[in-house]
Amino acid sequence: MKSRIHVQHGDITQLTVDVIVNAANASLLGGGGVDGAIHRAAGPTLLEACKKVRQQQGECPAGHAVITLAGNLPAKAVIHTVGPVWRGGDHNESQLLEDAYFNSLQLVLANGYRSVAFPAISTGAYGYPRPAAAEIAVNTVADFLARHALPEQVYFVCYDEETARLYERLLTQQGDE
């Protein structure tokens, strides 16, 4: 598993992978942070694809994930997942965050994609404490990879160095890197 999980500091929209995961809001129509950056980089075709998903199924609840084309991104697809808003930890946030990662990985597997890049879901405007969120992310991905051949490569793409170091520390403790 060591060679399957990677940490990168930088811009997730520039990474050449099969799938980029978007930390979306329930509307799927773009927003701030990584969601806005992905929508801007992908161009209007991504927004149109998200509008179609909304018409078919309505809003995307926390913990769920949907897949669309990638527009102008250097990826084949975008998985939009909605993480939980942090409300103190007593409102099922940890399970919802785990579900966001797991359901995204299920879509990667179901579509036969080999590589995926995750942002630090829910740690921006949604206020999830970074150490707890990173631990859930690393554990959920490691557990999934232990059971499945795909994806072959998972990237945690961190906007800042501090978060990248946090993920690297967790992976080292787990013996994955």
Swiss-Prot record:
Keyword Transcription: no
Domain Macro residue range list: 1-175
GO molecular function: O-acetyl-ADP-ribose deacetylase activity; purine nucleoside binding; ribonuclease inhibitor activity
Keywords: Hydrolase
Record's catalysed reaction(s): 3''-O-acetyl-ADP-D-ribose + H2O = ADP-D-ribose + acetate + H(+); 2''-O-acetyl-ADP-D-ribose + H2O = ADP-D-ribose + acetate + H(+)
GO biological process: purine nucleoside metabolic process
Main EC class the enzyme belongs to: hydrolase
Alphabetized CDD domains for the sequence: Macro_OAADPr_deacetylase
Tree of life domain: Bacteria
E.C. number: 3.1.1.106
Record's keyword annotation contains Disulfide bond: no
Record-listed substrate binding positions: D11, I12, N25, G33, V34, D35, S122, T123, G124, A125, Y126
SUPFAM superfamilies recorded: Macro domain-like (SSF52949)
Pfam families: Macro
Catalytic residue list: D35
SMART domains cross-referenced by the UniProt entry: A1pp (SM00506)
Description of how the protein assembles with itself and partners: Homodimer. Interacts with RNase III.
Function: Deacetylates O-acetyl-ADP ribose to yield ADP-ribose and free acetate. Down-regulates ribonuclease 3 (RNase III) activity. Acts by interacting directly with the region of the ribonuclease that is required for dimerization/activation.
PANTHER family: GANGLIOSIDE INDUCED DIFFERENTIATION ASSOCIATED PROTEIN 2-RELATED, MACRO DOMAIN-CONTAINING PROTEIN
NCBIfam families membership: PRK00431.1-1, PRK00431.1-6
Family from the record: Belongs to the MacroD-type family. YmdB subfamily.
Protein name (Swiss-Prot/TrEMBL): O-acetyl-ADP-ribose deacetylase
The encoding gene: ymdB
